[in-house]
């Protein structure tokens, strides 16, 4: 399977920070990292900072404050949101004949309800680490000039993480 998009974290870092067994094939993980980057990480960083980080990763030049940001803050949020997105698909298998529960050699597969509970726990972990990321960026915005930079039509950096039933925070552009 050809992968053309860069991942913000490596397989080694994902496995070091996640509860995922080393037995799970990387092909089941990486697409969820891409989705996590699109759904949570890019909106938290803003498009300009996200593109700067991804460009540095592609070039192998990620260093200094940017490396600290990725390794200490972005990586943890990415890991937990990736698990949140992946768990439902790691429990099932989509085949030509339909959707089936996976079988395992060394245990009993969990129910979809149990998988959902575990996934929700992963989402809560991801939200915690995403808030830490946002707080860090707000406190250190002078270290990341791209964080406050938004060109017309770009995704601005979000300063809001948790979503509840009623948000009374004012919105300013």
Question: Where do the language-model regions lie?
Answer:
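Conserved short "hinge" loops at termini or chain/domain junctions
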Residues: 1-75, 89-97, 101-121, 125, ...
């Amino acid at each position: 399977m050809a992968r053309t998009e860069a991942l913000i974290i490596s397989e080694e870092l994902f496995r070091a920070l996640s509860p995922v067994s080393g037995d799970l094939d990387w092909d089941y993980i990486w697409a969820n990292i891409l989705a996590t980057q699109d759904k949570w990480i890019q909106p938290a960083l803003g498009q300009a900072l996200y593109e700067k980080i991804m460009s540095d990763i592609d070039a192998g030049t990620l260093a200094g404050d940017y490396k600290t940001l990725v390794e200490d803050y972005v990586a943890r949020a990415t890991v937990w949101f990736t698990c949140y997105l992946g768990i439902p698909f790691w429990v099932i298998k989509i085949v030509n004949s339909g959707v089936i529960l996976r079988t395992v050699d060394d245990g009993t597969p969990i129910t979809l309800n149990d998988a959902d509970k575990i996934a929700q726990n992963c989402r809560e972990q991801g939200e915690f680490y995403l808030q830490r990321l946002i707080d860090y960026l707000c406190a250190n915005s002078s270290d990341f000039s791209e964080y406050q930079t938004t060109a017309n039509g770009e995704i601005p950096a979000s300063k809001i993480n948790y979503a509840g039933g009623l948000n009374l925070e004012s919105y300013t552009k």
